From Swiss-Prot:
Pfam family, one: ABC_tran
Protein name: Bile salt export pump
Annotated PANTHER family: ATP-BINDING CASSETTE SUBFAMILY B MEMBER 11, GENE 2, ATP-DEPENDENT PERMEASE MDL1, MITOCHONDRIAL
Cytoplasmic side: 1-62, 169-215, 262-319, 375-755, 816-869, 912-979, 1033-1321
Recorded topology in the membrane: Multi-pass membrane protein
UniProt gene name: ABCB11
InterPro entries from the UniProt entry: AAA+_ATPase, ABC1_TM_dom, ABC1_TM_sf, ABC_transporter-like_ATP-bd, ABC_transporter-like_CS, P-loop_NTPase, Type_1_exporter
Residue stretches making up the ABC transmembrane type-1 domain: 62-385, 755-1043
Sites where the protein binds ATP 1: 455-462
Modification after translation, per record: N-glycosylated.
Domain of life according to the entry: Eukaryota
Presence of keyword Translocase: yes
Domain ABC transporter: 420-656, 1078-1316
Amino acid sequence: MSDSVILRSVKKFGEENHGFESDGSYNNEKKSRLQDKKKSDSVRIGFFQLFRFSSWTDIWLMCMGSLCACIHGIAQPGVLLIFGTMTDVFIDYDTELQELKIPGKACVNNTIVWINSSLNQNVTNGTRCGLLDIESEMIRFAGYYAGIGIAVLTTGYIQICFWGIAAAHQIQKMRKSYFRKIMRMGIGWVDCNSVGKLNTPFSVDFNKINDSSADQLAIFIQGMTSPIFGFLVGFSQWWKLTLVIISVSPLIGLGAAIIGLSVSKFTDYELKAYAKAGSVADEVISSMRTVAAFGGEKKEVERYEKNLVFAQRWGIRKGIVMGFFTGYMWCLIFFCYALAFWYGSKLVLEEGEYSPGALVQIFLSVIIGALNLGNASPCLEAFAAGRAAASSIFETIDRKPIIDCMSEDGYKLERIKGEIEFHNVTFHYPSRPEVKILNNLSMVIKPGEMTALVGPSGAGKSTALQLIHRFYGPTEGMVTVESHDIRSSHIQWLRNQIGIVEQEPVLFFHTIAEKIRYGREDATMEDLIQAAKEANAYNFIMDLPQQFDTLVGEGGGQMSGGQKQRVAIARALIRNPKILLLDMATSALDNESEAMVQEALSKTQHGHTIVSVAHRPATIRTADVIIGCEHGAAVERGTEEELLERKGVYFALVTLQSQRNQGDQEENEKDATEDDIPEKTFSRGNYQDSLRASLRQRSKSQLSYLAHEPPMAVEDHKSTHEEDRKDKDLPAQEDIEPASVRRIMKLNAPEWPYMLLGSMGAAVNGAVTPLYAFLFSQILGTFSLPDKEEQRSQINGICLLFVTLGCVSFFTQFLQGYTFAKSGELLTKRLRKFGFRAMLGQDIGWFDDLRNSPGALTTRLATDASQVQGATGSQIGMMVNSFTNVTVAMIIAFLFSWKLTLGIVCFFPFLALSGALQTKMLTGFASRDKQALEKAGQITSEALSNIRTVAGIGKERKFIETFEAELEKPYKMAIKKANVYGLCFGFSQCITFIANSASYRYGGYLISNEGLHFSYVFRVISAVVLSATALGRASSYTPSYAKAKISAARFFQLLDRQPPINVYSSAGEKWDNFQGKIDFVDCKFTYPSRPDIQVLNGLSVSMSPRQTLAFVGSSGCGKSTSIQLLERFYDPDHGKVMIDGHDSRKVNIQFLRSNIGIVSQEPVLFACSIKDNIKYGDNTQEIPMERIIAAAKKAQVHDFVMSLPEKYETNVGSQGSQLSRGEKQRIAIARAIVRDPKILLLDEATSALDTESEKTVQVALDKAREGRTCIVIAHRLSTIQNSDIIAVMSQGMVIEKGTHEELMVQKGAYYKLVTTGSPIS
């Protein structure tokens, strides 16, 4: 009798069941989602929250760095105390000289008196004289400057170095925490977030956070200390003037606040747009073969560019705000100059409260402080960008997982038998809450039995397995193991009891031994060998160059589908799990391998609970219990005989399969009656007997008649990845030479109008500083004039000039900010687009290189384009600004004292040496840092792209450990970089004070001995030293410049590479009457990444137009490789592939592929709507909806699509994750049908379908083949026997060919494969 579904009592464990309601439903997931939504709406990152990952050591480093930054900041207003005193000395000295020049005055007894005048004979003037030795005074002041310079060198080094080290440590911890949280968030959450979106922070956002919490912050603290100290000094001694000067500070603060808020908001929007673009890039590069096959390169570039446009808009808006308010603040500062000198001169000249030196000291203390506030705006931009970037990262880190795979909570049973029950389970995928997948599913899976779940695609079979594995939690109801709700279990313990093999196996980038050892880390070599033998993988592994130590590429991409599946099965078997889940586990195998693996699985059944999802009745018959599923519910249960009597879901499945195979069996019996093949029945015992008999027979005759299965085309495994890298033709990343500045500049050529305007603004802004020095020295000179009215007149005129400079600065600063933001964003967008386009234009062999994994390429794409701006865009504005500054300063300086100017210029080489050293060392750091982060990016991409496999085998911690180990390299480099940058920064700051020291000493000599006016000394020194300061400020961008040269070099390397197969080329032959005649002529081929392994060895086969050719052979014999040659993913090393008599190498690549449609065994769908996925079949035109529907109907997917709430607008999720495999395959078939190709390639196109769908789709494919040339790769006889030509392959060559009847008459390899009962391989 068939068993009815029995509901057992459930043992609930205390606090672990807090989510159960009175009705038994479990609503914790829903509540969590609501909490997450509320949280995400209110997340705002405060500035100090950026340092939440700091340790006590980091805090100490930041405190010491801040203390040194404060001391450094005090140095500037502190030196003004010396400067003010020195000014009074200069003015007193010049005043004395001016008075002594008056006829009738002389210095008598250190007092100026009138002489030789009858009226004023010997009348004293009261002015002291003869007491000042100006040269000695300047020696004293020079000593003060030198002492402060040495202090600045020390504090400058410490502030940059300590903050850099602390930031590096915190960023490292932040990266680790973010990756840990992603890995423990659960499958449901990852479904709702694309892999590209989750990966983007690793390459972009963390860099922005680092910029906001490392050297920029130290410089900001230094800059903020100057105004604070200056204001304190001013208020303590000269409050009147200080109060007037500081009155404009609130307006400056308002501008700074607006900049901070606006930039933060715009940066957040910009980052989100880039994250979407990164998601597109990751998806496309991960699916490169599908994109190439359907000619989607241009379409994908356009899709990528659309997201870049949004980012560009926000970036330009950010530049407008920055330019406007930077100009606004400079305008206020110059207005403040005018006000301060006008009012200050009144206090000096009319009221006599202050000396000129005091006026200068107050003024410069406050104004330099205000200037530092203005210069802090780039830091504010970095802080705002860092906060915006941290917002989404911290939101993820703080999010509470619905299913925490690393939680230590939950029960662990000492013994487990494997009893599983579903209690009224209803389930919706988190990303598609409106679609009910399971609908009150109730079923019991008894321990030690093999239970098969059968039913049409989309019935919820695979979903049920995912609930057992606790990838998701049920929306309602519960799943129990040993009568315990699995939501109360320890997740890792539960998953360790489960082994899983899926239809589309995922193998990570390791040796085969390590791939299998992922199942159990403590497995010995003997365990690995035993598991490989049980999975029928041992023989092909031993044929590999390095056997179990062979490296087979990312995802196992260098193995055939069947070989990958067998390794995945070995990985599951080595766990020796109590519960084994088989989700279409053998669908990718040829019949030969499937039979052997099925027997191996049947041997492991003892003591294990096996739950199998399969479509083939031959696979299902070995089950003890069969459960029929339909519409998300279990509708029948029983043994095979019972379900056949019931005539329900299973009966319909078997009937369809039987009808399909009946013709096959009759044909075989007719052709081979002498072999007396017993007719197969539905009896489980008979099936197993015949299976074992066929296996025994195969051991005698199998493909030993054929040549021995060739070694699988894989590359030799090297002891390390570095050794493997040496074997590549491309240079290692560390060998890339920095790009030339000239070529980098050419990148911005299309934006020359913007850059011209911006450069004009920058030139004016650069001239402002030396003009300020000129006006400032002019004002000082007026205080030594004897005529008070003349003093007042000149000061008023100079104040008006300051107002004029303010107005000009407002306009030019805005012009510079806007135009360079515009040109920079256009450059970034174009570079990203060109880089992405160049990547998609590479040949498929290029993507086989381990350095060009999807993770590495998306990381490179995201960072390189933005970092190139470090040598172009706004950096050009900085260079023009600095160049103009120096040029105008030199002109002024040489006009007034060429000797003093030359003395100061002697210090310029020291500044240049500092910048050159910094550039050279940081360039090396940038290259190595990029390489190390790309390796980490490969790990994150591999883990997140295959999160189901990672979770299924419980290796989250292993990936986390590997990722964290890779982070050690960039961390150590960041420590070295902090020391180098700190030393260079301290030196560049110190040299200004040393230059001042020497200049004033020499200036005193020139005043004393050559009569140089003191105002000229001020004018020359101020102009030259301020211009040198501008150069020093420009050198602070050296790290960005160093990174830019490396990033640009990498871009040029990509853009300059000429792929052997250029998809964008318009060259090549085209013809109107494309027939579809195909000839493989003595084709020999080795994959570019493994040239030592021969995959095709003289493949020769021809087919006429509208014929069907079927390739038959063992896994790894080159069947799929031949299809890739036809698609021109690769070209043969020897021989030709002829299309209508044209050598494929000479045919236009776009024209060729536009006439070919392909349906692969593992369908790749994109994260867009079903409609867009089907439209992807023909990217040359806009496909009307009628054609899409017609193609869907032919592929038997239309009814399913119409049952969805959003119908054809339904998003299929990342890689089609929201659909069953059968649904994905049918959409892929519809995509091929809508292409209407002349040549149709079917690579196991129906292997993933249930019998009912397979029959209908096979009919559709048969119709689609009419009038077309078709190449079929299949393992099932029914799929290939009606082919016009059947080619049996082995060792990369065709060993026999003909029709089914001809090959049966020949009684060769094909005949024996059919007649012995041994499946076709």
